[in-house]
Amino acid sequence: MILDADYITEDGKPIIRIFKKENGEFKVEYDRNFRPYIYALLKDDSQIDEVRKITAERHGKIVRIIDAEKVRKKFLGRPIEVWRLYFEHPQDVPAIRDKIREHSAVIDIFEYDIPFAKRYLIDKGLIPMEGDEELKLLAFDIETLYHEGEEFAKGPIIMISYADEEEAKVITWKKIDLPYVEVVSSEREMIKRFLKVIREKDPDVIITYNGDSFDLPYLVKRAEKLGIKLPLGRDGSEPKMQRLGDMTAVEIKGRIHFDLYHVIRRTINLPTYTLEAVYEAIFGKPKEKVYAHEIAEAWETGKGLERVAKYSMEDAKVTYELGREFFPMEAQLSRLVGQPLWDVSRSSTGNLVEWYLLRKAYERNELAPNKPDEREYERRLRESYAGGYVKEPEKGLWEGLVSLDFRSLYPSIIITHNVSPDTLNREGCREYDVAPEVGHKFCKDFPGFIPSLLKRLLDERQEIKRKMKASKDPIEKKMLDYRQRAIKILANSILPEEWVPLIKNGKVKIFRIGDFVDGLMKANQGKVKKTGDTEVLEVAGIHAFSFDRKSKKARVMAVKAVIRHRYSGNVYRIVLNSGRKITITEGHSLFVYRNGDLVEATGEDVKIGDLLAVPRSVNLPEKRERLNIVELLLNLSPEETEDIILTIPVKGRKNFFKGMLRTLRWIFGEEKRVRTASRYLRHLENLGYIRLRKIGYDIIDKEGLEKYRTLYEKLVDVVRYNGNKREYLVEFNAVRDVISLMPEEELKEWRIGTRNGFRMGTFVDIDEDFAKLLGYYVSEGSARKWKNQTGGWSYTVRLYNENDEVLDDMEHLAKKFFGKVKRGKNYVEIPKKMAYIIFESLCGTLAENKRVPEVIFTSSKGVRWAFLEGYFIGDGDVHPSKRVRLSTKSELLVNGLVLLLNSLGVSAIKLGYDSGVYRVYVNEELKFTEYRKKKNVYHSHIVPKDILKETFGKVFQKNISYKKFRELVENGKLDREKAKRIEWLLNGDIVLDRVVEIKREYYDGYVYDLSVDEDENFLAGFGFLYAHNSYYGYYGYAKARWYCKECAESVTAWGREYIEFVRKELEEKFGFKVLYIDTDGLYATIPGAKPEEIKKKALEFVDYINAKLPGLLELEYEGFYVRGFFVTKKKYALIDEEGKIITRGLEIVRRDWSEIAKETQAKVLEAILKHGNVEEAVKIVKEVTEKLSKYEIPPEKLVIYEQITRPLHEYKAIGPHVAVAKRLAARGVKVRPGMVIGYIVLRGDGPISKRAILAEEFDLRKHKYDAEYYIENQVLPAVLRILEAFGYRKEDLRWQKTKQTGLTAWLNIKKK
């Protein structure tokens, strides 16, 4: 049995090594005679000698082609003659291949990217894991001493546990009196003892859980620090770290390192992938979790070490048990694909298919197509086609349902219609199958490459299903089920917390994309289009910041649609050198520099070191902005504006209001003409409502005139005369419902303010003075209100600074806009409610939620600079690095400052975060700053040396500035033509920012996207970088060698045709009602029929339809369900004849659902499905909400569990679990990523994060839980997803306390 293969180098030549197990013994076989090669297709075979002369250099050594032979192959089924070019060493291939490809005699090269050892296995027909050898498996796990914030492997390893079929033991270096614990003198001795265990037991397979990322790298690091060799390999070698995409993988020579984590993530969809969660999901048994802080506490105090040792031993034991279950499955996969299990267990589904096809292509003498380059990959991503047919479900509770499914619909179509790249539109063919709707033709004269391979795989899946039905072992059944359902879904989106700047109704706003899209979809529910799990809403009046792909110039383009999608899978948190960051799904694209241009790279393709596109400048609309105070006040509640009045001088307006109303009534035929009507008619003409003639008038805006009349009906009722000040006065609340009807020409004549206080004009011009005042406030200002001694409210705004000159300027500006102010030692105070309202509405109050006012973004550049100057004076400084530094606690404000700076052409920005404060560093000259020393050229104003090397083909020792680059081109030292390739980098609106960190995480929830007109890109993330909208384009495996868009759309077209054919025959000829269809299956019933009749007719139909379906297409009877209901597409629940409830899309399995929510949902499902009683389900919910309201639910059912996934200082949004964790950390408890926090939400005021306490600290005598929170955010959402299918709303499900009335209520009052 072959376990693995690699190669070593001796005397400059490769030697293949095959690691084997044979007759129970481990052995290594060597092959010194296999040479690396690639294929080349030449324009003319006579040029082979020219090609053979091509040379390259590798580490100072000349690389050349050492031999060439002409061979006959097939390419997509067609005969082709190519040259096989041989090389001395595998590393020669990447060194020379581009030179061969670029040679004028060469059309293309092939199979140049197949690793040498894998090539050997394919060519020699060797299959890993084939044979009946019994392999020795051993699992191990480590426990470490970790404190929050420590670097990786700083703390010692305190225990190493291992398990195999014979025993499970723990090695440690502190006294623990347990039979399975072996105690040694030190960490060093513990590692040496573990190495001895490995030598003695000599396992073929070493099993870990996340050993690639944690256990083995940690062990290697500690061994290095202790000066110990770690010869775990059978050849005496130490573990070898390898980069596989974005992750590190660890190889142990001669042994298979089987990291379960990768396999389980690929195979099973779980809400969390802790070892405990996986073990419970597979075996149905709980496993205790001991957290890092508990381990550290036990080790440091000596108390509880037995518990830690038991936990460590169980970790190894559980890892071994899981390994025993999963290893045979991966061994089968390794055998099928023909590649080593180490590689297979770490491969995506797409890569596994590729390796299978490569092996089969070699066997059939087919030349494998190349993987797509970046441009081709980008083109494929933009292609789209229609998917499977989904029928909206029939709502309601249904009895007697049958499930009918096509057996492997798409593979069956591929085989039946011979759908393959080599059969597509094949010339000279006698017989074709033509795909419906799309019209592509597939030749039937010979079997296509892919269809001929698929039948074996199809049969294998059917065999798995047969085994599942026959199996009585629940674990085996579950494992088989997981395997056949291992489908990975890619969504092309960004996460809800990411920021996006948009222009909506002419105003620049910065949103969290999740809040923005959710809000739009909630407000436009009837317009949302749903396709599977994806929701799309077409929109108007919204614009995004994008760039033109050709010119690289910034633009503002219309958003065509907003998109939301359910997603479970990996996401990538990408951090750039500037501090910008974004979290995106695997399939969403950012713009990466490649070969002189910007191309899209998906989340899983972006690598550390890549250069991403970020804005140098953005285009903001410029206009003279005016602040409408009335609009601000209308956003406040009536309680907040009860003391606000509007006033206007009497002079020139005596009797104006009544006269205008009488004139309007006369115009509408309700009164006689007033004597002074001409005065009012002239005013109406000035407002644009009428046009005066020599005699009479014409109404030119009747709708406007009617609204104006409504305004005056109200004004005449409420306006009062104030004789003391000879003014008319109106209470704002009296006209708040009509004030927006007042024309601006009239409104600007009024003043507005508090009843007995300061009043100001209704409009404020946003000039440079006002902008600077706002900048002062946003930087170091505060606005507050408080209850005064009279029971009313007092308001004040303060602007702080230590510099008298700055305070003088603050005082001057404050007086200009708000009249009298107070001056303190280090502040200027504006004790006026109107000032409070303006600053609070425009800028926010708390340091954590301040923002750049929207009106600043769309003002002139001079106004924007003035705001920044005020902000800089208040909250900026010149850092020792000679950079301007702006500081704030508000993440929203950081994004606003970045956008503002970009709009002024400032791109040399770096973002930081320390001690709870965000820093914005600017390395460019700003209008209001002076530098004594020359600044360094910042990263966004240089051409990186790797781009220079790629462009000009020579090595540059350092990056060079744009200015220097232009000089070198002008002086002829750099090739002008080549320089044109990157001209956009100097003259466009894009700069490049390097990726410095990538973290892969698991995410389950909604993800979001925008579709932007023409450009299909937009700014997103913290600090903003360009993201690509790929919603319409990512179908299939875009990196595939045998990619074929025509094939894919033909398969789905046939799929839609066959499922529709089945539906029609089932309904018209067998009397069924089809309730729901999803791509390859359906649910149906015969209303009113008995179960036996429905089953009998369904089986008859299956026989009937299968006789009509062509080729391998086969409909299967999947099962009968007593009862079921459908909510929406992909959301339904059924109960089978054995009483088992099956749900899809309704489950609440995540930890952040409390037990009461899960329990209530389960009872609701039982009431509906087992008893057929929806009213009973509603009653259950009402009883639970009543018990919650009366505090009758035990606290253990209210605990919500959430995991800490990153160091606490990295959290920007403080959820309840983070708040509890921070309080624990403040008490000295060590909190680390992976720790699960259980909390209960208490009754009270303020945000939930401040009212959440640790579950163990909840005391019934002291605490009351927040019943409203648990009803509104836990129980009702859990059951609404079910009961909304039956027409129930949230308010129908709550227990309502009956209000006492009449005599009973009076008697109760009297008793008190």
From Swiss-Prot:
Q: Which UniProt keywords apply?
A: Autocatalytic cleavage, DNA replication, DNA-binding, DNA-directed DNA polymerase, Endonuclease, Hydrolase, Intron homing, Nuclease, Nucleotidyltransferase, Protein splicing, Transferase
After translation, how is this protein modified?
This protein undergoes a protein self splicing that involves a post-translational excision of the intervening region (intein) followed by peptide ligation.
GO terms, biological process: DNA-templated DNA replication; intein-mediated protein splicing; intron homing
Q: What does this protein do?
A: In addition to polymerase activity, this DNA polymerase exhibits 3' to 5' exonuclease activity.
- Which PANTHER family does this UniProt record tie to the protein? DNA POLYMERASE CATALYTIC SUBUNIT, DNA POLYMERASE DELTA CATALYTIC SUBUNIT
Q: What is this protein called?
A: DNA polymerase
Question: A single Gene Ontology molecular function, please?
Answer: nucleotide binding
Q: Which CDD domains match?
A: DNA_polB_Kod1_like_exo, Hint
| Swiss-Prot/TrEMBL catalytic activity | DNA(n) + a 2'-deoxyribonucleoside 5'-triphosphate = DNA(n+1) + diphosphate
Q: What's the EC number here?
A: 2.7.7.7, 3.1.-.-
Corresponding gene?
pol
Q: How does activity depend on pH?
A: Optimum pH for intein splicing is 4.5-6.5.
| Claim: Transferase is one of the keywords in the record | yes
InterPro entries assigned to the protein according to its UniProt record, in alphabetical order = DNA-dir_DNA_pol_B (IPR006172), DNA-dir_DNA_pol_B_CS (IPR017964), DNA-dir_DNA_pol_B_exonuc (IPR006133), DNA-dir_DNA_pol_B_multi_dom (IPR006134), DNA/RNA_pol_sf (IPR043502), DNA_pol_B_thumb (IPR042087), DNA_pol_palm_dom_sf (IPR023211), DNA_pol_type-B (IPR050240)
Applied use? Used in the PCR method because of its high thermostability and low error rate. Sold by New England Biolabs.
The question of whether Hydrolase is a record keyword is answered with yes
Family as reported in the entry's similarity comment: Belongs to the DNA polymerase type-B family.
Domain named DOD-type homing endonuclease: residues: 773-906
SUPFAM superfamilies from the UniProt entry: DNA/RNA polymerases, Hedgehog/intein (Hint) domain, Homing endonucleases, Ribonuclease H-like
Q: Which positions are tagged coiled coil?
A: none
